[in-house]
Amino acid sequence: MNTKSRRLNQTLVLALAMAGATPLLAQSQARMVSPEQIQSYWLMLNTKVDADVPNSGRNMDKPGCVAVSYMIGSDGVPQNVTVRKVVPQSDLDAVAKSVASNFRYGPSLKNSSHEPVNTYFIVPFNLPADAAQRQSIISACKLPGYDQA
């Protein structure tokens, strides 16, 4: 094999490798957006989501929350849905993950390019009527690092 064709082969291999890595790079470089700022990029289309809640389990009747992180892809569908925090520890993590997985988003007017973003959602369970107590529980599930709007 001569030098010219060897260089061409190396260039083609490098180009193919870069093309395969592009979606992964885009995902890892997606902007981190807090739940309070998500409406600047994406609008939730389905405000009601069904979830199967088990009849029994650990701390199922206690007030609590689950923080679930995910990336909203360019198609408005959550990807890489991950349970990040459960307060108090309970068996509601799978319920929260299924809820977030079923969200669907449409781009905001500012996001006409359908820019993917990383965000999270706090799924509350059995919250008390008192506003201060509710806020205390929700605050325990906030995740750091999502303040870059």
Where are these regions (language model features)?
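A short acidic/small-residue loop/turn micro-motif
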Residues: N55-S56, K85-D91
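Short, ordered coil/turn segments that flank beta-strands lining enzyme active or ligand-binding pockets
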Residues: S74
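Bacterial N-terminal signal peptides
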Residues: T11-A21
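Sec/Tat signal peptide C-region and signal peptidase I cleavage site
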Residues: T22-A26
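Bacterial N-terminal signal peptides that target proteins for export
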Residues: N2-V13
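Short proline/glycine- and basic residue-enriched helix-capping loop/turn segments at helix->loop/beta transitions
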Residues: S28-S69, V95-Q148
